[in-house]
Amino acid sequence: MTPEITAEFVWSHIPKRPRESNKGSFGAVLAVAGSACYRGAASLTVEGALRTGAGIVTLASVEPVLAAVSARLPECCLCPCEPGAEGGISPQSIPRILRQKATVLLIGPGLGYLAPVSYTHLTLPT
């Protein structure tokens, strides 16, 4: 028989965080997301990362996206990028993006179909 999913059931399955922990104890997400036309994609991406327990979330994007996301989610760290084609991120921003510290790299939501910055351009140092 399938158990009834109640608030009590859900809370009983969420791991407890140690008292002596801090946001740096729970990973750092770097989201390369959004463009002038797709601001909501970046916002939903950041919100999802924060809600699922990421300690620090940094959004690398263009200014219109950063402004929209920071107004809604002030706990998000920002990595301003130069605008490129179609309101997306310019490849000139790649060095700045790669300097960010992260344990998880998320690329793509809202970059657009003509995005000059893609996974093939970005790797995280090990």
Spans of features found by a protein language model:
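Small-residue (G/A/S/T)-rich helix-start motifs and N-terminal tracts that mark the onset
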Residues: M1-L122
